[in-house]
Amino acid sequence: STPIKSSAASDVYKRQGYVDTKNYSYADFANEVNIHTGGISSTIGVYPSVKDKDDYQVKFEVRTKALYDKLPEAATLMKEMLFTSNIDDEKRLYEIIAELKSRLQVSISSAGHSVASTRAMTYFSKAAAYKDTITFYETLCDLEAHFDERKEALTAKLKEMVSSIFTKEHLLVSVTCEKDGLSIVETELEKFIPMLYETSGEEKQAEIVPVRKNEGFMDASQVLYVARAGNFRAHGFDYHGALRILKVIMEYDYLWINIRVKGGAYGCMNGYMKNGDTYFVSYRDPNLEKTNEIYDGIPAYIEQFTADERDMTKYIIGTISDMDVPMNPSTKGDRSMACLLYTSPSPRDTR
């Protein structure tokens, strides 16, 4: 898990398992992964600080799952993917961009609530701006339409990222296993670390400046995803665990009754993050103006809210049930890594 610069190239590079490597075609590589592991994947994780609303960390993450006796094969395949992927294959690179664009187009239509809420938060949140699906989609459209003009610059950027991401200084390893597996992991890490690059010179963190906009996006659909967002820390309020209960109250009372039952939307959501980012969003909603009026009524609803002990107990139980869920080893590892990165300062604060 390593820091990266802000670039659409990083999202394209997540598909590195989809290109030929030194020893395998991308189809053969996929077969080897399936034979020896439970999968190898890469993603970009964005971790807002719980202490500073303007601070965040971005990590390029490579993950795998494997049985103990298959850990050497898993490590070998990860090294094959990270250090020998052929990113000079322009034909394959174009195919990946076109595939990404097509899949993202479907995702935008099917998960409009997530797209809308994130986009609304980009107006004030740097972390949300990193995750903005619409900007990435627009970039992919541009890359596909002007691939011949951009391919050399894109390939150069991908190569630059390989040497700046996979460095010894940036390496952070999270392992979830029993003690028997830890010694095997340590042995494989001793082979892996010498292959990493040395950090060269002073690194520059890409600066994101949120811009407040007034916009809407049209889709080939008869329904809407209506979002409102803001940051309560920017207005002098701190995060409190009671906000988790408020989320349940809103979704099962005020928003549910007004947007789902009376308004006819398929769903409604809200969220309160520890960095202060907050959103309200409707799902497959036939209304725009009415839903916005309902959002306007939220402060008055909270000010006048009353509930007896029985109802509050139900809300609290509902809150805990969302938090206290069984976790498999993979989920436990994700949780522990997130807890570390959400609370630790970003690299630019430690330099």
Segment roles from a protein language model:
Residues 2-9, 13, 342-350:
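Single conserved hydrophobic/aromatic residue that forms the stacking wall/gate
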Residues 14-74, 249-255, 262, 271-272:
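M16/MPP (pitrilysin/insulinase) zinc-metallopeptidase core fold and M16-derived inactive scaffolds
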Residues 18-24, 54-107, 190-197, 270-327:
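M16/insulysin-pitrilysin zinc metalloprotease superfamily fold
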Residues 46-53, 214-228, 260-277, 284-295, ...:
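A glycine-rich, aromatic-flanked flexible loop/lid motif
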Residues 104-168, 323-344, 348-351:
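Scaffold signal of the M16-like zinc-metallopeptidase fold and its non-catalytic homologs
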Residues 156-164, 170-172, 214-216, 255-256, ...:
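Generic recognition of flexible, low-complexity loop/linker segments
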Residues 172-232:
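An aromatic/glycine/proline-enriched structural segment found at the starts
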